[in-house]
Regions:
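Short beta-strand His + acidic residue motifs that chelate non-heme Fe in jelly-roll/DSBH
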Residues: 112, 120-125, 133
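Non-catalytic, conserved peripheral segments adjacent to functional cores
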Residues: 1-107, 126-128, 135-188
Length: 188
């Protein structure tokens, strides 16, 4: 029996994964990754690095990708909530340059698989949000790259109004404030 179900998104290979959660008066139990179960669902990846971040409300991280040693990421929230976004950078894809976003929370327990060839970022919606991601390749500082979170060509709707966050409330790293623009990049 497979403890995961997949929901397709409008962008090929970018999927939402819903784990089966076993709950009772003690709490809950869930698998967050099972290589065999994922393979049954057509998800054949191998993870080599796990990352864990903690952020206050209004932190916007991204949009990150690596130009070589590209990373696929399986992401989830263990505390709090994020609006998670992926941008298709696969030049041969019919959805090249398109984005998709999903709400990940500690309550909904869903996971988002962002395959290799995508830029990735997220906006934290609560204080003390904890975010975990498994990566298919090691972090490579010399290949680290990104796109600007507010790139006018990609035009991501970060749903600030819906989440009661203003642009003035955002906390963004200096690096992410000056990432390249989509139509000026030659890195993908």
């Amino acid at each position: 029996m497979n403890n995961f179900t997949i929901k397709e998104t409008p962008i090929k290979d970018l999927v939402i994964i819903e784990p089966k959660v076993f709950g009772d008066e003690r709490g809950f139990f869930q698998e967050t990754y099972n290589k065999e179960s994922f393979a049954e669902l057509g998800l054949n990846m191998e993870f080599v690095q796990d990352n864990h971040s903690k952020s206050k409300k209004g932190v916007l991280r991204g949009l990150h990708f690596q130009t070589k040693n590209v990373q696929g990421k399986l992401v989830r929230v263990t505390r709090g909530a994020v609006y998670d976004v992926a941008v298709d950078l696969r030049t041969n894809s019919p959805t090249f340059g398109e984005w998709y976003g999903v709400l990940l929370t500690e309550k909904n327990k869903i996971m988002f698989y962002v395959p290799e060839g995508f830029a990735h970022g997220f906006l934290t919606l609560e204080d003390d949000t904890e975010f975990l991601y498994k990566c298919t390749n090691l972090y490579s500082p010399e290949h680290d790259s990104g796109l600007r979170w507010n790139d006018p060509t990609i035009n991501i709707d970060w749903k600030f109004e819906e989440f009661n966050i203003t642009e003035e409330d955002l906390t963004i790293s200096d690096k992410d404030k000056v990432q390249q623009l989509f139509d000026k990049s030659s890195t993908y």
